[in-house]
């Protein structure tokens, strides 16, 4: 029951510890108004629910991602492997109301909004990374850094997007590098449907 208004971004993480996921997170019944970027970012979350939130005039609704190489960290001496526990999974996104702002420019980069974006990552390891989908991925604006994250495909799995309502000039619901996910009962009503950045699902 929190309210976020006229701020840059809402709830969530923009960094992570490799192989140490966030677990048992509940983000419910919050209100987000007039946010420049995303309302909710679930980065390397597991066993999480995002339900009953109202997001009005936001740059993005709910962003779920397995790994974000450019902002992932390791503990000194930690042995890392792409087989570790860094696969975001078992996440429910349900009964949210999302209205997305017009596309804009943030820090000199084009920002195209989305209602719900569920994505994994293909990492090149210390040399950098491959972005998970389109070249205009709004989350990939930093320069690659050498941070010891091993190369690999970090798939997102077991995410359900259910009974959400999405409107605005944006992409509705996007999946990339995902498996065993489901999308059902959602309502997507977009404006300017003749443009490339206004895809339903």
Annotated model-derived regions:
Residues 2, 20, 24-25, 43, ...:
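Solenoid scaffold repeats with emphasis on beta-solenoid/beta-helix
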Residues 15-19, 67-87, 103-112, 120-155, ...:
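Intrinsically disordered, low-complexity Ser/Thr- and acidic-rich flexible linkers and loops
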Residues 9-10, 25, 95, 99, ...:
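Long, low-complexity, intrinsically disordered polar/charged segments
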